[in-house]
Regions:
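Enriched for short, Lys/Arg-rich terminal
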Residues: 1, 12-16, 56-88
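Arg/Lys-rich, positively charged N-terminal/basic patches that mediate binding to nucleic acids
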Residues: 1-30
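Generic ordered-secondary-structure signal
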Residues: 4, 26-29, 40, 72, ...
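Noncatalytic linker/hinge segments flanking ATPase motor cores
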Residues: 21, 44-47, 68-69
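Generic alpha-helical propensity signal that fires on short helical segments
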Residues: 22-24, 35, 50, 71-72, ...
């Protein structure tokens, strides 16, 4: 099983989300542990990892749309959630 965890900036943003938005983001974090390649690929300069994003619609969060940006390393079998970008 892949480990998925939040970076310090993502943890800070997480505290600013509503309870339903936090629950939706936590659901993504848990699902990354089972399927780390589920997000859409992003341009990445590091050949040893992949940058990806999972986009949550307002209907899924009960609030704003949220993009969960993360990096997956196959060598470490881990996902680091770098940013949580919340829309209007």
């Amino acid at each position: 099983m892949t480990h998925a965890f939040f970076s310090d900036p993502a943890e800070k943003i997480l505290t600013e989300l509503t309870p339903t938005e936090r629950a939706a983001v936590e659901s993504v974090r848990r699902s990354l542990e089972d399927d780390p390649a589920q997000g859409r690929g992003l341009p990445d300069a590091d050949p040893r990892s992949e940058s990806r994003v999972v986009e949550l619609l307002p209907e899924q969060t009960g609030g704003r749309g949220i993009s969960v940006v993360y990096r997956y390393s196959q060598d470490l079998d881990a996902c680091l959630i770098l940013w949580l970008i919340a829309g209007p």
